[in-house]
Amino acid sequence: MPPAPPDQKPCHQLQPAPYRALSESILFGSVDEERWWHSTAPILSRLLISSNYDVDVQYKYLSLYRHLVLPALGPYPQRDPETGIIATQWRSGMVLTGLPIEFSNNVARALIRIGVDPVTADSGTAQDPFNTTRPKVYLETAARLLPGVDLTRFYEFETELVITKAEEAVLQANPDLFRSPWKSQILTAMDLQKSGTVLVKAYFYPQPKSAVTGRSTEDLLVNAIRKVDREGRFETQLANLQRYIERRRRGLHVPGVTADKPPATAADKAFDACSFFPHFLSTDLVEPGKSRVKFYASERHVNLQMVEDIWTFGGLRRDPDALRGLELLRHFWADIQMREGYYTMPRGFCELGKSSAGFEAPMMFHFHLDGSQSPFPDPQMYVCVFGMNSRKLVEGLTTFYRRVGWEEMASHYQGNFLANYPDEDFEKAAHLCAYVSFAYKNGGAYVTLYNHSFNPVGDVSFPN
């Protein structure tokens, strides 16, 4: 039986009451923190209200945001007076605009997640060119604040996947070894449960480590997982995933290119030449015996035929749930009018002030290694919708919500989404949602939106 339809209530206030009340009593640590708060906290507050969090839980999460997250966002973005481009010194690999903050909305469960790339004023400078120090400090602070956070998995994966000081020095002395603009190695996220508990996650991107050691991303990721998985909980699922990756590398299951194949970018060269390439992993920061691992891979062929191949592991995963999920995924793809083509890794970021129309990137999948009896890890698809018209995308999502019986979401989501961006021209905006993910869990659709989470304030705002 499919899960109950998710909650969604209208929330269009420019200054939601919890945000307004806290703003009147906060002593900020710096002007940067104050500006980050007013640029982001109203969006978070509206998301919590519209997703029907209890009022006391809303205040708890906004307070957590102020005390833990704001100090980790680093210097506030600056607007270039000549180009009008708004950007931070450190370009975060978490967000295509380079910003270090992203709120995502799991609409299937009406749950909100806060993604953070913790930074300092030194991040991206010669003192800390790959931002290796601040994420650990941030997570250690989170572990002191939040019950149940266990950093064992973080330390284990950090040792295997993050460059050392000596390796950082090699990359600085030899810049041609790693020319990709995507330099983030550790990202973080907090799932805000409606009970008031928080699930903290860490994400590891080993491309700098790959460049300096000469080991492939796949080799680094797979060996790190096997090293921490001492009881072999993930072995069957991981081995089947590796077999699929190897078949793809040998040229099996590959459709014809649907568009003129563009040349590889500098970011592409950090990965396998195969169109389907291992990318990064994430882990829950709970006690190791309960921690899940998700293995992420990207696909440059963005079309439904390739989605179906990955979803079924080349036709090997064909249990009833997999096929029901695939049928629903086909409707989802059609409803959002997903574009298709061959998309390389972007040449660089699309900072605020640049045109986002037509911006393209590969799609991604994560494979959930959970230690269950299932021989294949459950996949979740992420399609890049940055560069597609944001209003049309939300209209397509509304069509899908009605298709699956999410009437409250269909009635209120579009208005709630647009309320987060009061100064945007929705006929032109193409950057308000970066990715949409789809999975099939517990007999129903599982959809998450990764949304733009920043409205500039003060002298950084766009001129009228």
Swiss-Prot record:
Pathway: Mycotoxin biosynthesis
Keywords: Aminopeptidase, Hydrolase, Prenyltransferase, Protease, Transferase, Virulence
Keyword Lyase belongs to the record: no
Residues that hold dimethylallyl diphosphate according to the record: 113, 201, 203, 294, 296, 380, 382, 446, 450
Residue stretches in coiled coil: none
GO MF annotation: an example: prenyltransferase activity
Residues annotated to bind brevianamide F: 94, 102, 205
Listed GO biological process terms: proteolysis; verruculogen biosynthetic process
Stretches that traverse the bilayer: none
Site, as annotated: Required for regioselectivity: 115
Pfam families tied to this protein: Trp_DMAT
EC annotation from Swiss-Prot or TrEMBL: 2.5.1.106, 3.4.11.17
Domain of life: Eukaryota
Keyword hit for Protease: yes
Effect caused by changing residue 102 to Q: Abolishes tryprostatin B synthase activity
Catalytic activity: brevianamide F + dimethylallyl diphosphate = tryprostatin B + diphosphate; an N-terminal L-tryptophanyl-L-alpha-aminoacyl-[peptide] + H2O = an N-terminal L-alpha-aminoacyl-[peptide] + L-tryptophan
Entry similarity comment: Belongs to the tryptophan dimethylallyltransferase family.
The protein's role, per its UniProt record: Brevianamide F prenyltransferase; part of the gene cluster that mediates the biosynthesis of fumitremorgins, indole alkaloids that carry not only intriguing chemical structures, but also interesting biological and pharmacological activities. The biosynthesis of fumitremorgin-type alkaloids begins by condensation of the two amino acids L-tryptophan and L-proline to brevianamide F, catalyzed by the non-ribosomal peptide synthetase ftmA.
Protein's UniProt name: Tryprostatin B synthase ftmPT1
Organism the protein comes from: Aspergillus fumigatus (strain ATCC MYA-4609 / CBS 101355 / FGSC A1100 / Af293)
Gene behind this protein: ftmPT1
